[in-house]
């Protein structure tokens, strides 16, 4: 399949398992608790309403979890080149989590209005429109989430 071809994959209003291709995918989970996996290509993924698990592969992917408590998984690269891509999370909110390797070399960096999740010199995720001070990185449970406000 040509890498520049766009493949449209659409779920239902119920929970679906949606699997992308090695090309450029446009995935819309629509409703329900979806499990979405993409591979190579610069993909655009929308989870829709529901608590979705979105695993993006190599390429520079743009992801919207939309409604629900979504989990974004960053470790689905199929390439031997770890710098080949990253996921750009467009709407990270309080109920969402990013699952990552849990490596001690991972860190959060504020770059302008975005936070970058970096492992060594490899960018794993760009989180749009959030402040690094509002996030916590948990190496034991291998996730990044909004910090819990102890006064709330």
What function would you assign to each model-found segment?
Residues 1-7, 104, 109-152:
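Low-complexity acidic/polar repeat-biased segments
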């Amino acid at each position: 399949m040509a890498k520049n071809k766009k493949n449209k994959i659409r779920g239902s209003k119920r929970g679906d398992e949606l699997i992308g291709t090695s090309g450029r995918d446009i995935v819309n989970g629509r409703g329900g608790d979806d499990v979405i996996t993409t591979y190579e290509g610069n993909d655009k993924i929308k989870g829709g309403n529901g608590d979705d698990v979105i695993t993006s592969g190599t390429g520079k992917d743009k992801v919207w979890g939309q409604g629900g408590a979504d989990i974004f998984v960053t470790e689905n690269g199929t390439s031997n080149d770890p710098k080949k891509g990253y996921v750009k999370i467009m709407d990270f909110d309080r109920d969402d989590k990013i699952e990552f390797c849990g490596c001690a070399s991972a860190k959060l960096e504020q770059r302008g209005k975005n936070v970058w999740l970096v492992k060594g010199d490899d960018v794993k995720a760009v989180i749009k429109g959030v402040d690094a001070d509002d996030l916590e990185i948990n190496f034991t449970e291998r996730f990044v989430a909004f910090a819990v406000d102890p006064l709330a």
